Amino acid sequence: MRAQLLLVVLFCLANTGLLLAGEIDQARGLELIQEGNTLVIDVRSAEEFAGGALPGALNITHLQIAEQITSVAPDKNAPVILYCRSGNRSGIAQETLEQLGYTQVINAGALISLQAAQQAALSQ
């Protein structure tokens, strides 16, 4: 019975985005984006990406990142910033890249939060 309850709780958390695959570091992500010359990858679907994305971001879904990353980021020690809708898919992509040996992967979390933080920084 406890095992079933635990599974239900984990399922609910996963569906709300509260159980994330990787730790979100939005502040560091924004800092590197503002410095420029940092690879930014939107891991959402092509349809989501077409609806709006950060300027200069590439679109590689979290399901395709392992196959496509070396073509855009051959240096495994260079910073790579990931984001998605909630931070969950970018967390999954972060874990994938770290398993492939990438050392500076930052899960910047949700696009809408990044956009709001950028606007706040510009208005100061």
Kindly label every feature range from the protein language model.
Residues 2-4, 17-38, 47-79, 88-124:
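Rhodanese-like catalytic fold shared by cysteine-dependent sulfurtransferases
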Residues 7-17:
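Bacterial N-terminal signal peptides
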Residues 40-42:
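Structural scaffold elements adjacent to functional motifs in cytosolic proteins
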Residues 83:
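Short, surface-exposed ligand- or partner-binding patches at beta-edge/loop junctions that are enriched
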